[in-house]
Amino acid sequence: MLSDLAKAEALLDEEYNGYGQIYCNNAMAQALHARVALYMQDWVSAINYSTSLIESDKFQLSSVNQTVGSENHFRYLWSNDDGYEIIWRVYLTPESYGGMLGQPFLGYNTDKVYYYPDYVPAQWVLNLYESKDLRDNAYFANAQTGHAHGLVWPLLIKYQGNASIISSYALYEVSMPKPFRLAEQYLIRAEAYCRQERPNYALAAKDLTKLRESRFESGSGTIAMNADNWMTNIANERVRELYMEGHRLQDIKRWGNLYNKGEGFTRTPQSCSLEEGSSLKRTADHYMFVWPIPRHEVEAPGSKVQQNEGY
């Protein structure tokens, strides 16, 4: 994979680097390389690649303290799928809109009156957001559901839908995936600073503070980092920023015993969740953190593939 990334970086023209790009470009390859380096615990490369993007004049964090129309830049990033920090997005149009990212979390298209969510945010996630952290307002809202009980639940509205597609087709829950954003690069570099041979918690704190200042009303959000709290701060900030963008499983898996004292994942029952599955617990070393290889691949003629442990 590293050789493929190197070839991509050499072949993809930097001329097409810029926010909101819909075609593969050099910056996207660098963003992927930074993520891969972090996963491989290559802290130096993770820092170098993320720094290249952070210091580029092509991107900047979408701030809640700047507005476009009636929305702040960060909220606009999600309602219109456009913003200065998007390194690469999967482009959708009213005529070709792909899947519905928001359907499992909202189910509003059912009757366009009430919400019928399959999943609701965990209460511990909602509790992570401080009062001036406007990611809370951009990601979550309380709304009445259309289920028989008619209860008001906290819902994920991050993928409520692209404003253009909603206005053209009255079709909700269609949002453009944004696999690479500048915000992730700050999180990558902050973690790498903490995990390198000689940790630099001051630089890590500077990166997290920079990110948080763009998300907090009036630019507050300063955070301190040290040898005792860095893991908790990194883990929590990745949840606050990247919630439901596909990073969590990989994060818990790669952190192992560093995170939550090796306790892995525990689901806590809450009022709007079903009893089944609400008591799920998986320690960091549980085999189910690695998915099974499809049976047909293991049993194919001539296959030398061995099934993952536990399956």
What are these regions, as identified by a protein language model?
Residues 2-103, 128-311:
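Acidic/polar-rich alpha-helix caps and helix-coil junctions
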Residues 109-125:
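Short, cationic low-complexity segments
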